Each structure stands twice: as structure tokens, then as C-alpha cells.
Amino acid sequence: MRKYFCFLLIALLSQSLLMAQTVPSPKSHFGFNIGDNYQLATFTQTEAYLKKLAAVSKKVKLQVIGKTEEGRNQYMAIVSDPSNLANLEKYKTISQKLAHAENISVAEATQMANEGKAVVWIDGGLHATEVVGIHQWIESIYQFTTRNDEETKRILANTIILFVHANPDGQELVSNWY
């Protein structure tokens, strides 16, 4: 009986740990699918979702890049292959050197271009009443975080995507008003 109880306990704990590591879908977090009629995510909900994604996915790194006028955190969710996220400083240095292009030879620039990664900036929510922007942003982060098809793997292996929330105050204001 004791062996059975121990086995059952280990099985339940293992399942709990696996479930805890699962990336939550927007529907499971917000209570609706992104794009559902008459449903808007607040910034407070979005912030909590970003934190969950960063906690459970090795493909997401969350950074606070400043404060808004109303004192909210402004986030950048960096999405890429985990090996790229582990070497962010290296790729940042390469990008900065190539952007400034000072005192580097053509050979050095070519080598850095071959070694570096494409950096893509995607922001959402700039104009608060244009609510599709921030919601597609949330869905895009989710899709890049959870999809495991060859095309997504290729994109994440070669690209560092900077998802920046452009207007947290506006999202909170409009979604609460709505």
C-alpha cells in the first residue's frame, strides 16, 4: 500500500510540474480568444501574461525598458531561440558595431554579419483606440513561443524579435472604458 501511495504521489507531482511549465494560451489566461467580439485585454492582464510566458518559456526574456507617464512598467518581450537569448549581449554588440560601422574593415563587417542575428522590432498598441495592434502583438508572442514547426524554428534560430508594448497606459484606459 505504501509503494502504491508513493507512486501515486510522484505521478501527481510530476504531472503538476509538467502542467506548471506549459505556456498558457491567451484564452486560458484572458478568458477569451484574441479577436473575440466584445473582448479586450487590459494592460494589467497583459502584464501578468507576459510574466507567465517569461517564467515558463525558454524562448522569452522579459525586460522593463522604462516607466510610462502613469507609472506603469513598459516591457520588451525578447523572443528567440534559447541559444540566442543566452548570447544576447554578444548579438547586441555585433548589431551596434555594424550599425555604427566605425573602424571596422569589410572583412570584419562580413564576419560579424555572418555571425550575428537579424533583429526585428515589433511594437503594438501605439494608438490606444486602435485595439487590434496590441491584441495581434499578444497573439504573435504566443504563436512564436509555442509553435514548433520547421519555419518557426528557422525564424527563431536566425532572428531576435523585440516585442515592445508601445502604450500600456492607453491599453488600460481604452479596455477599461470599453
Residue positions per predicted region:
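Positively charged n-region of N-terminal signal peptides that target proteins for export
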Residues: 1-4
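Bacterial N-terminal signal peptides
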Residues: 6-16
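Boundary at the C-terminal end of the N-terminal hydrophobic targeting segment
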Residues: 18-22
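Acidic/histidine-rich, surface-exposed loop or edge segments in extracytoplasmic proteins
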Residues: 23-38, 121-124
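Divalent metal-coordination and catalytic microenvironments
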Residues: 42, 71, 125, 162
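A non-catalytic alpha/beta surface segment that caps or lines the substrate-entry region
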Residues: 43-89
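Sec-exported extracytoplasmic/periplasmic mature domains
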Residues: 51, 55-58, 141-150
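Surface-exposed loop and adjacent secondary-structure segments within mature catalytic domains
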Residues: 66, 75-81, 91-97, 107-117, ...
